[in-house]
A protein has these predicted regions:
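N-terminal alpha/beta PP-like core and its mobile active-site loop of ThDP/TPP-dependent enzymes
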Residues: 1-236, 240
Length: 242
């Protein structure tokens, strides 16, 4: 990823923090996505550098944390040959990453030409932040890194939502009305969207108990009468029945 690293050094608008290991870099980017409102970005090198980042990416995927991974890659011709033939390796440390990381990312793309970088960057960012958030990954061959981008590039067109907020709300309220014993499971998404206050206000009006996941543990205080407990393998003392 030497040309990406060189470009990062020459850009005074970006702050780069060097980690001793790619796993630490990926986990740091994950943490940035959790506490901020934008994806943390992780830049890693080819082959083992990319595979070292996978644990941090999987962590971000499972916990719905927005994260952006950019990896260096072998020459685009070498990568294309590997993808076409299925050969395990041709270039030095070259590795076709898509089969390995597609199941733990919301979007993955190998950027095979410089004129497509705007499209992939915009689509990746949209994918990381839209709906249930998560990590995205762009793999950039070394020859593409060192080429000039054209002034005019095709961007990504944001798709229209299939359902409006009012339609989604109506559907949720309809199901809630049919429920005999409603229970709210509040997770990390409630905190990430800044909706904890609105959720608790709604549950209080409707007298609906709340159980939290590990990621949503701070959505509701443990002394709140609506708090039932913590789900998954962690056990907490529930409140008294109302």
């Amino acid at each position: 990823a030497m040309w990406l690293t060189d470009a990062l050094k020459r850009n005074d608008r970006l702050n780069a923090y060097c980690c001793h290991h790619e796993q630490a870099a990926a986990m740091s980017a994950d943490c940035c996505g959790r506490v901020g409102d934008v994806p943390g970005v992780c830049l890693v090198t080819i082959g083992p550098g990319a595979t070292n980042a996978i644990t941090g990416v999987a962590e971000a995927y499972l916990d719905s944390s927005p994260m952006f991974v950019i990896s260096g890659q072998a020459n685009s011709k070498i990568l294309q040959y590997q993808m076409d033939t299925g050969i395990r390796q041709k270039g030095t440390q070259s590795l076709d990453l898509e089969p390995m990381v597609s199941s733990i990312t919301k979007y993955f793309a190998a950027v095979m030409s410089p004129d497509s970088i705007r499209f992939h960057m915009e689509k990746a960012y949209y994918s990381a932040m839209e709906g249930r958030r998560g990590p995205v990954w762009l793999d950039v061959p070394i020859d593409v890194q060192n080429r000039q981008v054209p002034e005019q590039m095709k961007g990504f067109d944001i798709p229209e939502d299939k359902k409006t907020d009012s339609e989604i709300s109506s559907e949720a309220l309809e199901r809630l009305a049919k429920s005999e014993k409603p229970l709210v499971l509040a997770g990390f998404g409630v905190r990430a969207s800044g909706s904890a206050g609105k959720l608790l206000e709604f549950c209080d009006k409707q007298n609906i108990p709340v159980v939290t996941s590990r990621g949503g543990i701070d959505v509701i205080t443990t002394d709140n009468p609506l708090f039932v407990g913590l789900s998954l393998i962690h056990i907490s003392e529930p409140t008294r029945p109302r």
